[in-house]
From Swiss-Prot:
The gene is rps27ae. Its cofactor is Zn(2+). Disulfide bonds: none annotated. HAMAP family: Ribosomal_eS31. This is Small ribosomal subunit protein eS31. A zinc finger (C4-type) spans 24-45.
């Protein structure tokens, strides 16, 4: 059968359980955000956070 999908979102370091992905700030604890490389996205409400935001271009 393998490992349940939800179990893959946690890892154990130094005897403590740590989340690999953040929880959605809108939906609250228990709703993980999906990791899409350059961003995290919530599948429930659609909230998106970008990991590396480029600096806005300055107008002259």
């Amino acid at each position: 059968m393998g490992v349940p999908r939800r179990a893959k979102l946690y890892e154990v370091k130094d005897g403590k359980v740590e989340r690999k992905n953040p929880f959605c700030p809108r939906c609250g604890p228990g709703v993980f955000m999906a990791d899409h490389g350059n961003r995290y996205a919530c599948g429930r409400c659609g909230y998106t956070e970008f990991k590396d935001q480029p600096e806005p271009k300055k107008k002259k």
